[in-house]
Amino acid sequence: SSIGIHNAFTHTFKELGVPSPDAKTIRGFMGPPLESSFATCLPKEQIAEAVQIYRSYYKEKGIHEAQLFPQIVELLQELSKNYPLYITTTKNTPTAQDMTKNLGIHHFFDGIYGSSPETPHKADVIRQALQTHQLAPEQAIIIGDTKFDMIGAQETGIKKLAVTWGFGDEKDLMTYQPDWVAHQPADILRQL
């Protein structure tokens, strides 16, 4: 979803009439709550408007710009045979649901959990999924590509499988001492 996210951020800054941060800075916005990202470069009074512009663009265009990494459909097919799969994301739930439907992967997941004002951080969303499905932390593993995934896992006591493709920086991921590391989708199947 990085293309759609990047485009949504640049569109938002353009609509607000302010210079867009560089691509590296925008890449760093992928993972934390939108409000936190916008707070690093906009005045407080513009944050709510920025979030609204971003979400409107992302809902209309951004989710259609998302693409799956190679081998992900095959990975989801295999994992869903043996494990219940859930998405925990800092996107809001309807957007995440729309995106999975658009990508043709919605049917692989037993639940999709996104952020809300009550659950703004990754750990909050993970806790919501664990509680809803009555899972103990030791029964869950996060497969994540950002430090925010690793932090959310640490804060909730679940195991961490870091993937080195995607948004995150491999060096950043390693600082959170993941239980497993996957450099390609097939590595996940070998490690679980």
Give residue ranges: language-model regions.
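Conserved Lys-Pro-Asp/Glu-containing loop-to-beta segment of HAD-superfamily phosphomonoesterases
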Residues: 122-150
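A short, structured active-site edge motif that brings together acidic residues
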Residues: 106-120
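Conserved donor sugar-nucleotide recognition element shared by glycan-biosynthetic enzymes
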Residues: 5, 34, 68, 122, ...
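Conserved H-loop
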Residues: 19, 105-110, 136
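Short, acidic loop-to-helix structural element flanking the phosphoryl-transfer center
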Residues: 60-87, 93-97, 123
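Acidic, Mg2+-coordinating phosphoryl-transfer loop and its flanking beta/alpha structural elements
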Residues: 141-180
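Active-site neighborhood of HAD-like aspartate-dependent phosphohydrolases
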Residues: 1-28, 40, 47
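Helix-loop "lid/cap" segments that line or gate small-molecule binding pockets
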Residues: 12-13, 33-45, 99-100, 129-130
